[in-house]
Curated annotation (Swiss-Prot):
GO biological process: negative regulation of DNA-templated transcription; negative regulation of transcription by RNA polymerase II; positive regulation of brown fat cell differentiation; positive regulation of epithelial cell migration; positive regulation of lamellipodium morphogenesis; positive regulation of mammary gland epithelial cell proliferation; positive regulation of substrate adhesion-dependent cell spreading; positive regulation of wound healing, spreading of epidermal cells
Protein name: Ras-responsive element-binding protein 1
Self-association and partners: Interacts with NEUROD1. Interacts with AR.
InterPro entries: RREB1, Znf_C2H2_sf, Znf_C2H2_type
Species the sequence originates in: Mus musculus
Signal peptide: none
Organism classification: Eukaryota, Metazoa, Chordata, Craniata, Vertebrata
Length: 1700
């Protein structure tokens, strides 16, 4: 967009008629020539440098009305004119990409995407050098050229003077004249007071005024300055804040006589970029006047300036100040001499003349030597009123005790000096605190009449802290009992107003730690390092300082403490000096203090009575020092609590405590996706919207959505000219959304129970509630663990208050004030919850446990700076893995590929949230012996078969019993506990130990569990150990995700956006972006478990129960039919507590297919997500993508984006049958979207530099474009890729790259193992075909289709059913020929004990073999054939799935499992194509072009996925149309072959077995089998049978390949949809009844079915009720249709998968 297109100029207003008109005219000329409004985009040279002024002038002239230059229409506002003019541009077809907000027509969808950023204010592209952000990558790269120039001549252009500075639009083309202005980062310009310095050297270095870092480039400096945004421009002495560095420097120089200094402590003025250059500001006076030297001297001493000229440099050597003339400099130098000498003399005199004791004595009497009081003019006289006093108080970072009369007006050091002789608390006491004092740079002399004189200390030496004279002056001038109005009565509001903005982080500069003092003599610095601003030691956070009360009590307190500690008063001073080191507690203790209440300084009430003060005991002191937690006197509520790190003042200590957390980096409100730490929940909610793309505030006028209300208001003001608050509010619509709940899910650690998700509202209630979990033994805690104990009788209590109550009642001798010390917080020794490591750490850190230090774990587990720390007296809880990289991040089996998708998500990190990568194969536990190491919970734990059924209870509160199930198991940990649990969404693990450890122990308690079959990457909050310890093991993300309690997802930390291949597998870039974003968005269930089953899997439906979403059926609940393993119960989960959970089973395929469409939120949630490998592509719709954004804008322009959401609801409403047609309809009905997608694809087509998207054919000129585009791809790719490699463990001959068996599957027997492998292949095929079909269904997410091919296929029950269908029909034909009675046995018994029988059954066709070798050869035959079957099955998948759904939920679990197995069949488009190609090779042979047709069909498929063009657009090019089903074909030959599927004609006949084939090459292949069969009779038979199945599926697959959209058939006969469902259910019943019929009946029925088999396969959608297949099915139903088995026997069903 040109800089002079009005909309293009984001930063400038829309008022430039002239500019706009030129753009319009150019557009008009372009459009006349047939071009699209590209003219708007072609950058025109911007007008001259004064164009802004000129434009404004013209605007003023023409403001009254706006005439369209093309049609003379008069518009009232410029915005209307712009909108109107754009309507002139729509005739070229650009209207397809018109902006719904401003009407601008754009050439392509991607241009529109970019343009929408203008309205949204998003700036996705950031300059790597200076961080300035841009809406388009082109602008960013244009901007980057400036840096290239900058490196050579950094500032050839003068920065603007402060008067000229303005916010520049980030859209500015920073070229030509624009460079003459300062292109500071838009939105981020830091006004750091640089004024124009035209003569800077080209190689000048820019210094950060805060930390003195050097930068070559001004942009770097400006960006860097943002890192100091949390270090507000505040005076360290008087806490006044400034907008600019210049203001602060000026203030410091003027008021505090303080100059900026560099890191070495030298004056830093002449090279300081923050200081303006030149003396032009002195122009207010005539330089020729006689007093000019004096004026300029005075002015330059307070207004720091830099010399510009090398010839005329008049700089003071002492203070580095510059002056405009020599005489000014000479005058200035004189000012240095007396000041320095005077101070030196004064210091030596004072130190020599009097001893410290004498001064202390005088101070006690309120006296001081007259020579100590320097007559300094009072610069400001504060009135003696509340507000002044409050202000004065707030000038100190450290809170003082309000009871001290002088403390309000005296700096901490002075207060320290007010007391009696030196008070030192006994060094052994735990309440030795550090005192971080700030530089004593300004004193207040309190005069006897209570007036306060502010006495500035002049000169640089003011920075020194231990200025004893000043301290003593302050002390001496304070009358002993001065009375000041109590702060509690002061109004709080003025203060709140004064300290308006809370800058985020960083304590104020430094304050050297001092010991706590209540003495008159100033304590020496503990740390020799003199505090110059910025040298704070990170390890010494300022501690709260509480003072003893007045000077008189101080003395008594001193004596009291001295007598207790046995110190004589005379030795106090030496003691103080000697003990400086002793009193420095170790860092751990400091950390503890930080984490305890002393984090928050609380001002104690002013009106404490003297008698209380005189009776100060150690307990009281301790309470005062640590900040009383619970028992505050009522007055305390009225005290104000200022923040030590910033200006804010709080009325409640709790609020302050929460606020301080944000400074310390331990805020519970941390973003899980990035490193953002919010000060409060609201800020976090706002921040999360940037990730989720959620925009709850909608402009009612143009329906544009905004993330933040302020933006919406600004939009209304600027775009719709709404001026009044009422108008603005009236036009903002708020759409409530789940973000707040999401935030609650992971950032309300203080109230939400991690185990059951209950929101307890109060943290204390939560802590007590957590004990109920512990007492159940969920986490392996002691069953009745009670954290509080009575010191007298050791009685344990659940709550502290109970213990106090007990002490009050039972131990009457305990004085009330000491009760607190009689409550012991027991953090028991090495309980089951503690690992050896913890014990060790506990030992190291010391064992003195006082109640103050044994606060509930949560207090200490708040992460600081990204890592969790624990109190010194507390071990790291066992759930915090000591290692930063858990072993579980990598597969335990060293033959498997490393999985780096979990890298960096170690439990120690704050933001990891993946429920671990459970990457263990059966061998992994054996491989990794962790008996000698601390138990690392990050290693995935093996699953016990029995536990698989304890599926996540759908109810939030059900987990406990199930986790409890683990209890009875042997407590010894398995050789390798491999369940890694990320216990808390934030890693801040704020729940007490037991809670979190629950998961751990649950994991530990299952020694003989079976190793997990695959890696599960659940992005699910861990609410319950049951959820964690069982569900992830099951790989049942669906269950988790559908669980209402769990719909608040965790967000794993996103990996880098650009592709970065990991070690062994190519991990596509966004391993978890989809998870992140979809989880943030309203469809959290888009995340699917990552299933990679390296090991062998078991029989078909073993994951059935586990995978069914809500299923919480315990083992026992499995239906009787499943005698073998209750795991395999196919019964629908009874416990699905919400319709959504139940949906996946009942709606089955319907839900799934619908959920595949983009924007499908509910569908997605319903989806079982069986073990699907990846995130559904739909989740891309949930990203903060432009498309989603546009979808929210209510305009038909983007109906393609909105369409899916509508379809979604329609489909879900319509139920199963409708679903099959939905996709096809969508397919046909979205040509507009095709155009969008086509345009999207072409938007960068002709760019020179081409970066290919790894997931789709799109090409991008910049990495940033690719990054943005990558957001449209989900996680699936990475998952599937990840799966690919483990898949290699299996020998899936024909599909080398394809998939490992299902994750949830646990192995039952070698036979069943083989079955599983076989089935995996069987399912793989359908999934593949299904994927292709999906692509047809969803033209919109074309790019994503690829990804979805693998996932979607696996997700849906339909795939299975499809494979069932195709295999059923094949089986019928095979059965007819071979009359295999055993097959019946195989199929019927496959679900029963037959699995364990020595016979080896083929899971695809049910055939039994005596020898395993025979079976494996037989399977190889299937592996060749099944890809075809898969393809064939696909067309029917959806219909069949629906049918099954109609019939009953039974199939749904089975499909869930099957696809899981077939999950990774097509991990990547490449693989998929490879497998298709392979099929083609196998199937093609020397045929009459059938192969070609098939290949061509594949071609169709491939382009369909590869190019964003949808199938519909391609269909037009195919000229041959089937008269029956209206499908189109490339050639007559293809059509002829296709017609055979309608006619049932099978012209090719095998001479040996008289079997007939639709395709010639099928016959040829079949005959090869006979040749092999001569060598091995059994094998021949098998392969023949396989071959037949393959041939059937081939003709079907040809059909489907050539016309992928088999739904079209269904569409053509809408009325058949219901019927289809019925026939499918017939097939279902056929499958089950098939099992129950006698072999003869079955054979007969299947013979009858055989002719129709190909027909059914070819076009399941159009199955005629009277078709032979239907008749056959009816026959079979007559044989024995028993619904219960259908429901319960998925095992058998899944084995029939290949047979029916």
């Amino acid at each position: 967009m040109t800089s002079n297109s009005p909309i293009g100029l984001e930063g400038s207003d829309l008022s430039s008629i002239n500019t706009m008109m030129s753009a319009v005219m150019s557009v008009a000329s372009v459009t006349e020539n047939g071009g699209s409004p590209q003219g708007i985009k072609s950058p025109m040279k911007p007008p001259g440098p004064n164009r802004i002024g000129r434009r404004n002038q013209e605007t003023k002239e023409e403001k009254s009305s706006y005439n369209c230059p093309l049609c003379e229409k008069i518009c009232t506002t410029q915005h209307q004119l712009t909108m109107h003019i754009r309507q002139h541009n729509t005739d070229t077809g650009g209207a397809d990409h018109a902006c719904s907000i401003c009407g601008k027509s754009l050439s392509s969808a991607s241009s529109l995407d970019r343009h929408m950023l203008v309205h949204s204010g998003e700036r996705p592209y950031k300059c790597t050098v200076c961080g300035q952000s841009f809406t388009t990558n082109g602008n960013m790269h244009r901007h980057m050229k400036i840096h290239e120039k900058d490196t050579n001549s950094t500032t050839a252009a003068a920065p603007p003077s402060p008067l000229k500075r303005r916010r520049l639009s980030s859209k500015r083309k920073l070229s030509h004249d624009a460079e003459s202005e300062d292109p500071g980062p838009a939105k981020k310009m830091v006004e750091d007071g640089q004024s124009g310095d035209l003569d800077k050297m080209s190689d000048e270095i820019f210094h950060c005024p805060v930390c003195f870092k050097e930068f070559v480039c001004k942009y770097e400096l400006e960006t860097h300055m943002e890192t100091h945004s949390d270090n507000p421009l505040r005076c360290d002495i008087c806490c006044v804040t400034f907008r600019t560095h210049r203001g602060l420097l000026r203030h410091n120089a003027l008021v505090h006589k303080q100059l900026p200094r560099d890191a070495m402590g030298r004056p830093f003025i002449q090279n300081n970029p923050s200081i303006p250059a030149g003396f032009h500001d002195l122009g207010f006076t005539d330089f020729s006047c006689r007093k000019f030297p004096r004026i300029s001297q005075a002015w330059c001493e307070t207004n720091l300036r830099r010399c510009i000229s090398e010839q005329h440099r008049f700089v003071c050597d002492t203070c580095d100040k510059a002056f405009p003339m020599l005489s000014s400099l000479i005058l200035h130098r004189q000012s240095h001499i007396p000041a320095d000498q005077g101070r030196e003399k004064l210091q030596t005199k004072t130190l020599a003349a009097e001893s410290l004791e004498q001064k202390a004595f005088l101070a006690l009497l309120g006296l001081q030597h007259t020579k100590d009081v320097k007559p300094a003019p009072a610069e400001e006289l504060l009135p003696d009123d509340n507000q002044a006093i409050q202000l004065q108080t707030l000038k100190y970072q450290l809170p003082q005790e309000p009871g001290c009369p002088t403390v309000l007006s005296v700096s901490p050091l002075d207060a320290a000096s007010l007391g009696g002789s030196l008070t030192v608390l006994p060094a052994t006491k735990e309440n030795m605190k550090h005192l971080s004092l700030q530089p004593f740079q300004k004193g207040f002399i309190i005069q006897p009449d209570s007036s306060i004189v502010v006495k500035p200390i002049s000169g640089e030496s003011a920075i020194e802290l231990a200025d004893i004279q000043q301290i003593l002056k302050m002390a001496a001038s304070a009358p002993p009992q001065i009375s000041l109005p109590p702060l509690s009565k002061a109004p709080a509001t003025p203060l709140q107003a004064i300290f308006k903005h809370m800058p985020p982080l960083k304590p104020k500069p430094l304050v050297t730690p001092r010991t706590v003092v209540a003495a008159s003599t100033p304590p020496p610095l503990i740390n020799a390092q003199q505090a110059s601003p910025g040298c704070i030691s990170p390890s010494l956070p300022p501690q709260s300082l509480k003072f003893l009360k007045g000077s008189v009590e101080a003395v008594s307190n001193v004596h009291l403490l001295q007598s207790k500690s046995g110190i004589q008063p005379s030795t106090t001073t030496q003691l103080f000096l000697q003990q400086a080191g002793v009193e420095l507690p170790g860092q751990p203790e400091m950390k503890t203090q930080l984490e305890q209440e002393s984090i928050i300084e609380a001002l104690l009430p002013l009106n404490m009575e003297a008698k209380i003060k005189q009776e100060i005991t150690e307990g009281d002191l301790k309470a005062i020092m640590t900040g009383p937690s619970g028992k505050k006197t009522p007055a305390m509520r009225k005290v104000l609590y200022p923040c030590r790190f910033c200006n804010q003042v709080f009325a409640f200590s709790g609020v302050l405590r929460a606020h301080v957390r944000s400074h310390l980096g331990i805020s519970p409100y941390q973003c899980n996706i990035c490193d953002y730490i919010a000060a409060d929940k609201a800020a976090l909610i706002r921040h999360i919207r940037t990730h989720s793309g959620e925009r709850p505030y909608i402009c009612k006028i143009c329906h544009y959505p905004f993330t933040v209300k302020a933006n919406c208001e600004r939009h209304l003001r600027k775009k719709h000219l709404k001026a009044t608050r009422k108008d603005i509010e009236k036009n903002i619509e708020y759409v409530s959304s789940p973000t707040a709940e999401l935030v609650d899910a992971f950032c309300a650690p203080e109230t939400v129970c991690r185990l059951c998700g209950e929101d307890l509202k109060h943290y204390r209630a939560l802590r007590i509630h957590m004990r109920t979990h512990c007492s159940r033994g969920l986490g392996g805690c002691h069953k009745g663990r009670k954290p509080f104990e009575c010191k007298e009788c050791n009685a344990p209590f659940v709550a502290k208050r109970n213990c106090i109550h007990h002490i009050l009642k039972q131990h009457l001798h305990v004085p009330e004030k000491d009760i607190e010390s009689y409550v012991l917080a027991t953090n028991s020794g090495l309980g089951p919850a503690d690992t050896p490591t913890d014990a060790a750490s506990r030992g190291e850190e010391g064992s003195c446990v006082t109640f103050a230090e044994c606060k509930p774990l949560a207090t200490f587990l708040e992460p600081q700076n990204g890592f969790l720390h624990s109190s010194p007296t507390q071990p790291l809880p066992s759930h915090i893995s000591v290692k930063l990289e858990p072993a579980s991040s990598f597969a335990m089996d060293f033959n498997e590929p490393l999985d780096f998708s979990q890298k960096g998500l170690a439990l120690v990190q704050v933001k990891q949230e993946n429920v671990s990568s459970l990457l263990t194969s059966s061998s992994s536990s054996a491989l990794y012996d962790c008996s000698m190491e601390p138990i690392d919970l990050s290693i995935p734990k093996s699953v016990k078969k029995g536990d698989k059924d304890t599926v996540v209870p759908s109810d939030a509160k059900k987990p406990e019993p199930e986790a409890g199930q683990a209890e009875p198991l042997s407590p010894r940990p398995p050789p390798c506990p491999t369940l890694s649990v990320t216990v808390e969404p934030k890693g801040s693990l704020e729940t007490p130990t037991g809670t979190v450890v629950a998961v751990t122990t649950a994991a530990k308690l299952e020694p003989h569990t079976q190793p997990l079959q695959g890696s599960v990457q659940l992005a699910v909050p861990i609410y319950s150990p049951a959820l964690v310890s069982n569900t992830p093991l099951l790989g049942n993300s669906a269950a988790l995700l559908n669980n209402p309690a769990l719909l608040r997802p965790l967000r794993p930390k996103p990996p880098l956006l650009l592709p970065k291949p990991s070690m062994t597998e190519e991990l596509p870039p966004l391993a978890s972006i989809a998870q992140i974003i979809s989880s943030v968005s309203s469809a959290p269930t888009l995340l699917k478990t990552k299933v990679a089953d390296p090991g062998p899997s078991i029989t078909s439906s073993n994951t059935v129960a586990t995978d069914s979403p809500g299923s919480s059926i315990p083992k026992a609940a499995a239906t009787p039919t499943d005698t073998t393993s209750s795991k395999e119960s196919s019964e629908p989960p009874p416990a699905a507590s919400s319709p959504e959970e139940a949906l996946p089973t009942e709606q089955g395929p319907a839900a799934t297919s619908s959920s595949r469409k983009r924007g499908r939120k509910r569908g997605l949630r319903n989806r079982p997500l069986p073990n699907s490998s990846a995130v559904d592509l739909d989740s891309s719709g949930e990203f903060a993508s432009i498309e989603k954004m546009l979808a929210t804008t209510d305009t038909n322009k983007f109906s393609p984006f909105l369409q899916t959401a509508e379809d979604d609801t329609q489909e879900e409403v319509a139920g199963a049958p409708a679903d099959q047609h939905g996709p096809a309809d969508e397919e046909q009905g979205s040509p507009a979207e095709d155009r969008l997608l086509r345009a999207k694809r072409n938007s960068y087509a002709n760019c020179l530099q081409k970066i290919n998207c790894p997931h789709c054919p799109r090409v991008f000129p910049w990495a940033s474009s690719l990054q943005r585009h990558m957001l449209t791809h989900t996680d699936s790719q990475s998952d599937t890729d990840t799966l690919t490699t483990p898949g290699e463990v299996l020998d899936l001959t024909a599909q080398a790259k394809e998939q490992p068996p299902a994750e949830g599957a646990s192995e039952i027997s070698p036979a069943s193992q083989d079955l599983a492998i076989k089935e995996a292949k069987a399912a793989a095929a359908p999934s593949e075909e299904e994927e292709e079909k999906e692509t047809e269904e969803n033209p919109e997410p074309e790019e994503e289709c690829r990804v979805e091919e693998s996932t979607g296929a696996a997700d849906a029950p339909e795939e299975d059913t499809a494979s069932n269908q195709s295999l059923d029909l094949d089986f019928a034909t095979k059965l007819m020929d071979f009359k295999l009675a055993e097959s019946e046995a195989g199929s019927v018994d496959s679900q029963g004990p037959a699995q364990q029988e020595p016979k080896h059954a083929c899971d695809t066709c049910g055939k039994n073999f005596k020898f395993l070798g025979t079976l494996s050869r037989h399977k190889k035959a299937h592996s060749c054939q099944e890809p075809k079957e898969e393809e064939a099955a696909a067309p029917s998948l959806e219909n069949e799935g629906v049918g099954r759904a109609v019939e009953g939920p039974s199939p749904s679990p089975e499909p869930e499992e099957k696809p899981a197995e077939s999950l990774a069949i097509d991990p990547t488009p490449g693989t998929r194509e490879a497998s298709v190609a392979k099929q083609n090779e196998e199937t093609e042979g020397p045929t009459d072009g059938e192969g070609t047709a098939e290949k061509r069909g594949d071609g169709d498929k491939r382009p369909k996925t590869d190019s964003p063009k949808s199938m519909a657009s391609k269909a037009d090019k195919r000229k041959k149309v089937c008269s029956v089903c209206n499908k189109r074909f490339w050639s007559l030959q293809d059509l002829t072959r296709h017609m055979r599927s309608h006619t049932g004609e099978r012209p090719y006949k095998c001479q040996t077995c008289e079997r007939t084939f639709t395709l010639k090459h099928s016959l040829v292949r079949h005959q090869r089998i006979h040749q092999k069969a001569r060598h091995s009779k059994h094998h021949g038979k098998d392969s023949d049978k396989d071959e037949r199945a393959e041939e059937d599926s081939e003709d079907e697959s040809t059909h489907s390949a050539t016309n992928p959209a088999s739904e079209n058939e269904a569409e053509s006969a809408p009325s058949t949809s219901n019927h289809v469902a019925v026939t499918r259910s017939r097939k279902e019943s056929l499958s089950t009844s098939g099992k129950e019929c006698s072999p003869e009946e079955r054979a007969a029925a299947e013979q009858a079915a055989e002719p129709s088999a190909p027909k059914e396969q070819a076009s399941p959608g159009e199955t005629d009720p009277q078709s032979p297949a239907a008749i056959v099915q009816d026959l079979l139903e007559l044989c024995g249709k028993r619904p219960a088995p259908i429901l319960a026997a998925t095992d058998g069903a899944s084995q029939l998968l290949g047979m029916e």
